[in-house]
Curated annotation (Swiss-Prot):
Principal subcellular localization: secreted
Localization per Swiss-Prot or TrEMBL: Secreted
Purpose of the protein: Putative sodium channel toxin.
Bridged cysteine pairs (disulfide): 42-65, 51-72, 55-74
Gene Ontology MF terms: sodium channel inhibitor activity; toxin activity
A GO CC term assigned to this protein in UniProt: extracellular region
Record organism: Tityus serrulatus
Keywords: Disulfide bond, Ion channel impairing toxin, Neurotoxin, Secreted, Signal, Toxin, Voltage-gated sodium channel impairing toxin
Domain of life: Eukaryota
Signal peptide boundaries: 1-22
Organ and tissue specificity: Expressed by the venom gland.
Name the record gives this protein: Putative sodium channel toxin Ts38
């Protein structure tokens, strides 16, 4: 009985690890900021993911995410610096 419990826990843990890794691989896509330009969300063709960070400059209104939702490049509005920042 102990072996069954152990393997059940191991199986559930492996499913959790697989889901986390799968999510990180599909999070590339565009992001949009809120009205204040602070919180960003990555848009994938199937779902929307939050970048969980504040943009370095509040002027960022659009951009794109690379790798997963914690790495975002910010574009700036017309008249602002054209450089991209990562946070």
């Amino acid at each position: 009985m102990k072996h069954l419990k152990f393997y059940s826990i191991l199986f559930l843990f492996s499913i959790f690890v697989y889901k986390v890794n799968a999510l990180q691989k599909i999070l590339d896509g565009y992001f949009l900021s809120d009205e204040e330009g602070l919180f960003l969300s990555c848009k994938h063709k199937f779902d929307e993911y939050f970048c969980l960070e504040k943009c370095v400059e509040s002027g960022a209104k659009d951009g794109y995410c690379v790798g997963h939702s914690f790495i975002c490049f910010c574009k700036y509005e017309v008249g602002s610096s054209p450089r991209h920042f990562m946070f």
